[in-house]
Amino acid sequence: FRDEVNHPSQSADKYYQTKGGYESLIVGCYSNLKNIYNTTTYQIFTQQGTDVFTQNYPTEVAAMNQYTTTYQSNNGTIYAMWSSYFNALNNVNAAIDRSKSVILKTDDPDGIEPSALTQLVAEAKALRAWYLFEIVRNWGQGPLKINESKEPSYTVEYSNGAAFYQQIFTDLEEAIRVLPWRQTGSNYGRMSKAAAKHIRALAYLTRGYEEYADPKDFENAFKDAEDVYLNSGHKLLDDYAMVHRQSNEINDEIIFPIGFADGANYNTNIWNQWYMMPYAIGGWLGLGKDSYYGNASMHVEAIPTKFAYMMYDWQKDRRPSVTFMSPLNGNASTSTDGKDAGKNWFQCTTPVDGVFAKGDKIIYFPVPTDPEYKYWAETDKNGVRYKVFNYPMGDDTNWANDDYYKHAYQTTNSTSRTCLPIWKFKDGNAEYREDESGSGTRDIYLFRLAETCLIAAEAAVMNNNDQANAEKYINYVVSRAEKHSPQGGLSRYSNVTIDNILDERAKELLGEGSRWNDLQRTGKLAERVLKYNWDVSNIYGGTIKTTLTQESFERKFKLRPIPLQWLNSLSNGHE
């Protein structure tokens, strides 16, 4: 993307009529993606309160994770996300509205080519469709903004979900007619036909569950997803590890990334801090703040549930070794970040005389692909200087005796947990920063083809239980997962169910996509959260009760509440 240029002597209206000005306006529309998806707020909003992620600090009552009585319309996370989506929406509306005044090359030699302008507007419409979709799937209604707001508005009118989807599909149809299947070269990272069709497939799929659905929604979702798979030129990579290898981040599977790069203002990705054990504040002798592990935010907001660890078969499935700290990630030639820090143990970064030398083992996580993997009894643990945290075993719904979920187990930090970190987002270029600001350079994958396959599989199940296509597309993903695994033999699906789809989405996309929306869309949130998220059903040992039930999900939790802070800013906010 091009750098934006400030022209203080020129009005914004005049500047955005020029070729360079309008191009910078579109660049700004893409920059808004970082303001939404590169935030810990987004992590809380999309991962907490699910079957595969829970809170790191068990001594806190977390409304977004535990669905307590404190989950109300004044929730700051919900307001922040609402504001981010509408701010981004206003910028794309500005780009679309102002396109009518852009000077064309047919009228001025310095103007923009009409075909180039048409494509930029199509990109903006695809982005607008995505933001509108995010709003409607999370809140179900709201002000349907399709024009730029240049001044504050203190009165609004709500539009229902059906109206939102009508606009979404109109924008996507117009974008799909114009955009190329893929964006390459200097245009890589821009909206494409494949990205727009992926969005439309997901939008059809999501609307298909609603009371106002069109009878052909699931059929249309499948058609769009299959079209992307067959005709876009995107391919599932042979090796899951190569999907997440930082040195291979531009690859055939990625449909739409959010771009980061070296250099000031571009190296701001914070995903490498997510799901990372807060090692530097955990009271660990010999583990200090160091760029070897980079930032591990003291505000880690989500850690995997026991179910998230135990759903994988490490011997038959390549994905867990890529996803978590593991021997694979401890080898610079195979690791996701090209370094050796991802081995399944933390090493000493701050030597302690007579106790730990630099590089000594401090915390050890036995994992099933480790040649020395075993269950460590307390007597075994007492025989070594370092601390050992056993991999979860037994009932995946009961965490009471698992090392990962004990409060301050073997550490002086009385609030945090110590569990095997997710490593697939780690960044070989990130550095340690005291202010915890982002320093990562790797892209965020917003859409990739494996998810498109799982959209196709889910749509097939919901479209008159089309098992032939459901099995085909879910097993494309499973077949790739088996490749390069230690043993192979990963079972394929037959008679696919929605729970199978949710399981496979969790394994393939852990931490990448919005898990909360997957459970919300399918109506499985209460069932799976109450079963697999111990922190929801055992708040303070059961002394505080969650308000989540299937009935309360349908009545209250299926949609996010309209933020009270926003309503209070309106003159008609309480009508």
Q: Would you name each region that the model predicts?
A:
Residues 17-19, 23, 27, 31-37, ...:
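Conserved, well-structured interaction surfaces
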Residues 134-143, 206-215, 464-465:
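Short coil/turn linking the two alpha-helices of tandem helical-hairpin repeats
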Residues 1, 54, 72, 85-88, ...:
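Long, intrinsically disordered, low-complexity segments
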Residues 2-60, 194-197, 202-391:
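An aromatic- and glycine-enriched ligand-binding surface/loop that stacks and positions planar moieties
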Residues 75, 79, 334-335, 339-477:
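C-terminal substrate/ligand-recognition segments
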